């Protein structure tokens, strides 16, 4: 989503609160909880889940391994839920032609660097760069090339933009910033 006027362009960036992350977190939580309950029921020799009789699963080694997988899955699931609740990666890109400043803001993980803010002068922007990698895992990423600082990604690598969409976005941004476009 973006908002544009004659002098200001604000591009909102979606973070980790995506439907796919919610789905993976739920699937991982339920699956790992099932593994952990089966491991515990094999240890207690009692049916905690009625689908699998605990007599069929011996605690050592199957129940122990399933308990380990369940705990590992719960840790990964809790990590996913934390990134979703903190909305890591969300933010905005603000291009202000009137003041000649570009602000790139992102939310990070809690701590000292929770708020990530880059302020750049528009005169330091060399170009808008499109990086295209075709093949099985095709990806197209839009970068802003800065003098002395390298390239700053403006789109996420998991955004599946079509070639037409990425070209249009790059052309509009390059026209707004009055810089050339490079394709790699």
Swiss-Prot record:
Transmembrane region(s): 22-42, 57-77
GO BP field: photosynthesis
Record-linked Pfam families: Ycf4
Keyword check for Plastid: yes
GO cellular component, one term: photosystem I
Membrane topology value: Multi-pass membrane protein
UniProt KW keywords: Chloroplast, Membrane, Photosynthesis, Plastid, Thylakoid, Transmembrane, Transmembrane helix
Superkingdom field: Eukaryota
InterPro entries, per database record: PSI_Ycf4_assembly
Location of this chain's protein in the cell: Plastid, Chloroplast thylakoid membrane
The family this protein is said to belong to: Belongs to the Ycf4 family.
Function: Seems to be required for the assembly of the photosystem I complex.
Protein name: Photosystem I assembly protein Ycf4
Organism of provenance: Populus alba
Gene responsible for this protein: ycf4
